[in-house]
Amino acid sequence: MANKKIRIRLKAYKHRTLDTAAAKIVESATRTGAQVAGPIPLPTERSLYTIIRATHKYKDSREQFEMRTHKRLIDIVNPTQKTVDALMKLDLPSGVNVEIKL
């Protein structure tokens, strides 16, 4: 797999679980001898939802809820077959969305 690059994009609602998952990926990739760039923090996506508290009237009484999606990017340069096998066997915490591009 010479001159290849693996780009891993992580998403999660909780930044601590995201950071532990990124640390596990970086640690397993460096242990197998690949060069790692990252984790690079990407902009946090913020969704704001406004809901009327009452069921029928009282439109002035509203409540706002916020959902933040934290993102990280990891590039693995020149991965070996050991690196790919280690990434496939890696156990990541639940709640982390992983997208891998070769």
UniProtKB/Swiss-Prot annotation:
Domain of life: Bacteria
One annotated GO biological process: translation
Alphabetic keyword roster: Ribonucleoprotein, Ribosomal protein
InterPro entries referenced in this protein's UniProt entry, alphabetically: Ribosomal_uS10, Ribosomal_uS10_CS, Ribosomal_uS10_dom, Ribosomal_uS10_dom_sf
Entry keyword annotation includes Ribonucleoprotein: yes
One GO cellular component, as annotated: ribonucleoprotein complex
One Pfam family recorded for the sequence: Ribosomal_S10
Residue ranges of coiled coil: none
Similarity remark: Belongs to the universal ribosomal protein uS10 family.
Function: Involved in the binding of tRNA to the ribosomes.
SUBUNIT field: Part of the 30S ribosomal subunit.
Name used for this protein in its record: Small ribosomal subunit protein uS10
Organism: Streptococcus pneumoniae (strain Taiwan19F-14)
Chain's gene name: rpsJ
